[in-house]
Amino acid sequence: MPETNIDAGPNFFWVRDDWRKELNLQEPQTLDDVENIVRAFMKYKGADGLMADTSLTTGTGFSSEYLLNLYFAANNTYPKQWIERNGTYQYDSINEGAKTTLSHLHDLYKEGVLDKNFLLRTSNDIAREIIYGRCGAIFGPWWVPNNPLVDAIKKDSSAKWKPYLIKTNGNSTTYHSVIPSSKFVVVRKGYKHPEVIFKIISVIFDYLRYDHKNVEDVNRYYEINVDPTARPIAINVDYQDALKRSYYNISKILNGASSKNIMAIDVPYATACKNYLANKKENSAENWAAYASRIEALGLLEKNNVVKVKSGYFSTTATMNKKMWKLKELESDAYLQIISGSKPVSYFDDFVKQWKEEGGDTITQEVNNEIRNKEKASET
């Protein structure tokens, strides 16, 4: 049973909006605005610089927290992705736009706008900084209200986190497409009841009979924000445009429509959103998280110009199997050393040369051959 990955869109800039308003800062629209807000938070609120995960950008295509994809996208670059340029697919980590981005990130690191300790931080460490009010701005996907922001609200109910969609290309926000599937549920041969997998998936994700005696148990599971990894089967099976569907389904219910014929997963979130809107000042952090993620963030995706760039290849070639691990290590080391100043920006050219010589050119050829062969096969 494959997991069907949804289109999660680009990362948002999540901001302590109570701090922003207190300091009379304009709502962020560009990366320049992002940096000005971080500078102000550092100066007047004693906050850390912009937090970043050392992976810097997404690999398989998933949006994740604390990543700097938007900076690369602003230079028309999508690291770790195979992007078509001038008729052939290229590994975008070696694109000249990456060099430009790394140079700028080095400047931010040197200034402290990019957290000086990001090379040493773990995700748990970053979450602690957020929860205890030492961080007021992060990049993250639509779901970060569920983790870690919900815990920040529990710790300090006066914290008002708000998502903003940052423009990377004129009036649009660009991001790359995701791998269609990356996880699978397998059942051993001879297992007595393999159909139970499909039944569980149907209960969690499909349309649900709302007169069933156990429906409240399932709905409550979502309403109290149980972590998805606690599910009996820890995969998502949904439409690619599930976020759009969820936003419109919940919006319909909030506007008075019946919850019948609405996907089961959306109904408890709609209830949580209703509860939040009924009393914003005295409400649970979980209700806020449902509204901030499912209405505020997803609403921004629907109401703004969001452009998806196609990632052309997600499989594995013969040379990738042997050498890609080493090339990824080379890439990570080069990126982090340039940002931190251990290597000059010009080292990027040495990295690209080494990447090509140590298997990158061969992999590029293999990727393009596979893509061409698939295109030819689809034409016959």
Language-model segments: which ranges?
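A ubiquitous short alpha-helical element
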Residues: 3, 88-92, 313-322, 337
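Ligand-binding "clamshell"
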Residues: 148-169
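Conserved small-residue motifs centered on glycine
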Residues: 206-333, 342
